[in-house]
Every structure is written in structure tokens, then in C-alpha cells.
Amino acid sequence: MTATLIDGNALSKTLRAQAAERAAALAARGHRPGLAVILVGDNPASEVYVRNKIKACEDNGFFSLKDRYPATLSEPELLARIDELNRDPKIHGILVQLPLPAHIDSHKVIEAIAPEKDVDGFHVANAGALLTGKPLFRPCTPYGVMKMFEAYKIPLQGANAVVIGRSNIVGKPMALLLLEAGATVTICHSKTCELAAHTRAADIVVAAVGKRNVLTADMVKPGATVIDVGMNRNDEGKLCGDVDFAGVSQVAGHITPVPGGVGPMTITMLLVNTIEAAERAAAAA
């Protein structure tokens, strides 16, 4: 068996075109969607992520604002800038690129963002609302994975799903979205005993731990859907995920590649969340 490839690039292109149409409709009414991205320090990976987010905005008719600060920026200065953006009617979404320098409390920074502009979905108000099934925003990466399941008609109701990873950014919200969709969900992590015993029984496996080859072919049920959220580098310096793609793709029914899988969807869902924020603001105006 050779798995069907879940093409994040192609799906992302379709969804971005839809987002661009919605953005144009809002702009015609005087409510062009606006996203502010804040980068503190000079982390090379963060610089790439921010550049890609700004480009996605520009390519799809969004207003974008990039604030770049040195790593010496103080926490009070950052909080003051977020307060300004919270009050700026041109800005509908605020994103602070993580990680932040060690002297800045990322939790305090995230909580400073107005919940209605928290397009990452990390604010405690949105995280709590996700638990009730009625969030303002779904975190972008898990939201993108759910769109992949929808596009490729992967049945979730009654499915056994394993999420490897328990981060607030991917693992926990991914489990909640799968649960809401009717799956029976198991969360595995670094302390899990017999990881393979869980994954072999799963119809769906989402790997999100940032560790190469955490999932190999012998750990996968034939025909299962495997979603690789990991972003790592192999010994040659090439981008790879958490899944042994060469082996698992011969066993799984569906699989996402790295690159070209979940990555493009994360930025796309950031656009979707920003559109939704702008539409709410326009409706309230």
C-alpha cells in the first residue's frame, strides 16, 4: 500500500483564494482586514516565519504591520505596544512571534492581547472557549489539520485518534478539536509507556513533538491517516517531520509530507482567523 498524499500546498491555495475574496468584500465596505506581527530578537527561524506571514497577507489583500524590535526590548515596552494595537481599529489580529527572549514572560504577553484580536487562539479566554466547543478562534495549526480531514473526507466520528504531543499550541487543542468531531482521543507524550501500542490501534495519528522518527512504519495501523506536524532537520540539514515518511507512507492510507503538508495550512488558517476577526468588527461597527 502506498499512502495518498495530503497536499497542504494545494489545499492552502484554495483556502487562500477564498480568504482573498472575503478580504476584498470587506475592503469594499471600508473594513480591510489588518494583521500586526511582532518580532522580538533575531531568531533566524522566527524571521522566516514572520516574513512568510507578512507575504501571505500582502498576496491576499490584507493590511499588514510588522513591528521588529531588538532582543533588549523590555517587557513593559512590549506590553505597551500591544495595548496600542488593541486600540487600533485598523488592526483585527495581533500575533507575537514565539519564542520571546528569556526576560519576557510569554504568558503575560499573550494574555495582554485582546481576546477578539488573538488570532493565534492562545489567550486563556479563547483556550477556555475551545474547551466548551465555542471558541472565537481555533489555534491555526490544529485548525488547518481539521480542514485537511474535511477536504480529504477522513471520517472522524467514531475513529480512534492518537495525538503525540501535549503542547498548548498544537497537542492539547488538536485533541479537543478531534474530540468535538466525535473521535475517541488518546494523548501521548514523553512520559507515555508503550507508545507503539497506542499508535497501532489508531485510525488517525497526529505527530507533534518536534522529534525525528518518533513514528515509524511498524507503529502504524495499515490504512491509518498520519498527520506530521513536526519541523526538524535531518543529518543533511534538510527539513523533515516527526514521522519516518519513507516507511510510514508504505503503510498508511493518507499521510502529510514535510515540507508541503501542515506548514502552509498554519499560515492559511491565520488568514482565516484574521478575516473572521475583521468580519466581527465590521458587523459591530
UniProtKB/Swiss-Prot annotation:
Q: What is its EC number?
A: 1.5.1.5, 3.5.4.9
Q: Which residues form a coiled coil?
A: none
Enumerate the InterPro entries for this protein: Aminoacid_DH-like_N_sf, NAD(P)-bd_dom_sf, THF_DH/CycHdrlase, THF_DH/CycHdrlase_cat_dom, THF_DH/CycHdrlase_CS, THF_DH/CycHdrlase_NAD-bd_dom
Pathway assigned in UniProt: One-carbon metabolism; tetrahydrofolate interconversion
Show the catalytic activity: (6R)-5,10-methylene-5,6,7,8-tetrahydrofolate + NADP(+) = (6R)-5,10-methenyltetrahydrofolate + NADPH; (6R)-5,10-methenyltetrahydrofolate + H2O = (6R)-10-formyltetrahydrofolate + H(+)
Instruction: Enumerate the Gene Ontology biological process terms.
Output: L-histidine biosynthetic process; methionine biosynthetic process; purine nucleotide biosynthetic process; tetrahydrofolate interconversion
Q: Name one GO cellular component term.
A: cytosol
Q: Which residues are involved in binding NADP(+)?
A: G165, R166, S167, S190
| Subunit field text | Homodimer.
Which family is this protein grouped under? Answer: Belongs to the tetrahydrofolate dehydrogenase/cyclohydrolase family.
The protein, known as: Bifunctional protein FolD
Organism encoding this protein: Burkholderia mallei (strain ATCC 23344)
Name of the gene = folD
